[in-house]
Amino acid sequence: MNCNEAIEYIHSLEKFGMRPGLERIGELCRALGEPQKGLKIIHVAGTNGKGSTSTIISCILQKAGFNTGLFISPYVSNFRERIQYNGGMIAPEELADCVSAVKNAVENDLAPRGIQPTEFEAITAAAFVYFKRKGCDYAVLEVGLGGRFDSTNIIDAPCVGVLTSISLDHMAVLGDTVEKIAFEKCGIIKPGSEIVAYPFQDEKAFAVIRKACAEAGDRLTVPDIGKISVISESLYGTEAEYDGLRFELHLAGKHMVYNACTAIEAVRALHADISDAAIAEGIAAAVMPARLELISREPVILLDGGHNEGCAEAVADFIGRHVAGRRIVMLSSLMADKDVDGYLRRVAPFAAEFIATRADVPRAMDAEALKEAAAEYCADCRAISSPAEALEYARSRVKNGEALIVCGSFYLAGEIRDQMLDHNN
């Protein structure tokens, strides 16, 4: 099996759908020799900020000298982004080897017993195999969906459990209230862990978190809002201070400062040999594609893959403080199963011109339908179904001193980012 065959095998499991539960991943891990056992894990759940918080934690641990694994989703441009070691993507041959081990376990052990893992379960198991083989000092695991029944939750009690911002999303699976969603996220809270929570949490979510920690007998740490100060912020980065520790952050948006403070408390909760210098260096090293990513400075081109109301609020806040003085062209694709109006009413009013397109995935909303929805908030809307053609048109409509904002979907962000980088090269 080569790398492409490994990825094809993983994607072939998509037909088995998304089926929450720990039975299948448990059987798969047992067939693989329990590779998740013995790993020192930082487990990160939440609605928004999971990927960035996980990445910052991973970068800090690396700067402190620890060999660190990182498991995140979704990927933007390359499938191998999902499994990383010391800041680098898993090598193609290593992905092939780990997925081959998973495939053999499925075909020789699970399938004969009528057990069929899902796509996410298979890639989670491959990550466990990889981290075990690499001898990671720590592994940072981002939850895929929810927490309680997510395949990453097959682990024993993590060293630290982290809960990022919790809000309404994936309501068909997780529940239709913040309390129900928080309950699912709090499934990662287990006796014997340190728990850290994002500071600006919905109070209803906080109540659920506090209750879960009390029941598990775990200490809950929340960054002290009074010790957070943003010193300077621009399109190009942020300088901030938390609890006497000054740091530079290249992930855009004030919410990223709060994610960084959450990460600081998470690594402190490990009680490991991690200096303030390593923390500052790790935060400065953290980068993530398609999170208010600045692709071009002039004209400004920003790329954001967030898709729910919380993400829309972060994008709107950033636009309002750093881009609103420019004429803005917005290029967007949204998934039909998301709260489309909730997203659009926050971001579309900033657009002088709104271009609706359709990312190349079945769940994507039709471009014409998105255009009609956006017309409630922007007077100048058009639909161009092809993302490549939409990008070409959008770029023709933006000149120096103006801004193009691509937003609403990681699928679109991946397509556009690849096109932009190819164009720039």
List each model region and its residues.
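N-terminal leader/targeting and accessory segments in enzymes
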Residues: 1-48, 52-67, 76-78, 194-211
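ATP-dependent carboxylate-amine ligase catalytic core
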Residues: 22, 29, 34-37, 63-156, ...
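Nucleotide phosphate-binding/pyrophosphate-handling subdomain across enzymes
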Residues: 38, 133-134, 138-141, 149-162, ...
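Hydrophobic alpha-helical packing residues
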Residues: 57-62, 131, 374, 420
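Beta-strand->loop->alpha-helix junctions that form or flank phosphate-binding loops
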Residues: 72, 197-200, 212-234, 249-254, ...
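Acidic, Mg2+-coordinating active-site environments of NTP-dependent enzymes
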Residues: 110-112, 122, 134-142, 158-250, ...
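C-terminal helical cap/extension that packs against the catalytic core
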Residues: 200-221, 236, 268, 300-301, ...
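Active-site-proximal loop/hinge segments that shape catalytic or ion-binding/gating pockets
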Residues: 409
